[in-house]
């Protein structure tokens, strides 16, 4: 019995540790949401400087007043404001007209503002070639239609074969002419055979004389 008693309190100990981890995760997520909810300091500074109408630029004190009016905690984020000003000056978005570092007056760089606006137009122009590329893809479908044309060109080759057969027919006709030339020689021989026929006709002429002699004999009787 004494051995089973100390085991019971050891079981709830891990159950107490698990909710602590969950709370830590929830608190970390909440802190991340709080940081992500507000805009960055650099954007607030640029908006405040752009809203001012002072030609000489906005001083650090005037900038802090503008940020405080926008609901930004200037006292807690004083170091962030100074770092944001230095980074904006180094990037070229702000121009420091007076002073050095974070102290002094700051003015919005118009060239940088126009330079930022131009790349947006370039991006829009770059989007148009994509549409043109899509239109260029459409003619690829017509290439599929062009393949039947190649097949149509191949079909006349079959028609050329009968032409070759016609050539063979012409060659076959030429021997016929040669055969027709051979019978011309035998035609001369019948002409020679006709020549003796008139000679044989002379004895036939003598037959009537015999008939006349027979008639004369009959008269004498």
From Swiss-Prot:
Post-translational modification Phosphothreonine, affected residues: 18
Segments of skewed composition (Low complexity): 1-17
Protein's cellular compartments: Nucleus; Chromosome
Residues that bear Phosphoserine: 2, 105
Keyword DNA-binding: yes
GO cellular component, one term: euchromatin
PROSITE patterns: H15
One annotated GO molecular function: structural constituent of chromatin
N6-(beta-hydroxybutyryl)lysine PTM positions: 35, 53, 65, 86, 91, 107
Role summary: H1 histones bind to linker DNA between nucleosomes forming the macromolecular structure known as the chromatin fiber. H1 histones are necessary for the condensation of nucleosome chains into higher-order structured fibers. Also acts as a regulator of individual gene transcription through chromatin remodeling, nucleosome spacing and DNA methylation.
Domain comment quoted from the record: The C-terminal domain is required for high-affinity binding to chromatin.
Protein name: Histone H1.3
Organism: Bos taurus (Bovine)
Gene name of this polypeptide: H1-3
């Amino acid at each position: 019995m004494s051995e089973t008693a100390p085991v019971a309190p050891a079981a709830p100990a891990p159950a107490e540790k698990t909710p602590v981890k969950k709370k830590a995760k929830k608190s970390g997520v909440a802190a991340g949401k709080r940081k992500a909810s507000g805009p960055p300091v650099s954007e607030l500074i640029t908006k405040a400087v752009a809203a001012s109408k002072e030609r000489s630029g906005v001083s650090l004190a005037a900038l802090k007043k503008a940020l405080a009016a926008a609901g930004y905690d200037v006292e807690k984020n004083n170091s962030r404001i100074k770092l944001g000003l230095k980074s904006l000056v180094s990037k070229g978005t702000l121009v420091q007209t007076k002073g050095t570092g974070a102290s002094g007056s700051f003015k919005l760089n118009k060239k940088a503002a126009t330079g930022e606006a131009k790349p947006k137009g370039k991006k829009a122009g770059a989007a148009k070639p994509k549409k043109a590329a899509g239109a260029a893809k459409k003619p690829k479908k017509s290439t599929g239609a062009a393949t039947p044309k190649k097949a149509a060109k191949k079909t006349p080759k079959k028609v050329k074969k009968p032409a070759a057969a016609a050539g063979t027919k012409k060659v076959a006709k030429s021997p016929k002419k040669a055969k027709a030339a051979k019978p011309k020689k035998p035609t001369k021989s019948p002409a020679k055979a006709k020549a003796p026929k008139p000679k044989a006709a002379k004895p036939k002429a003598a037959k009537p004389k015999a008939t006349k002699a027979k008639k004369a004999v009959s008269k004498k009787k």
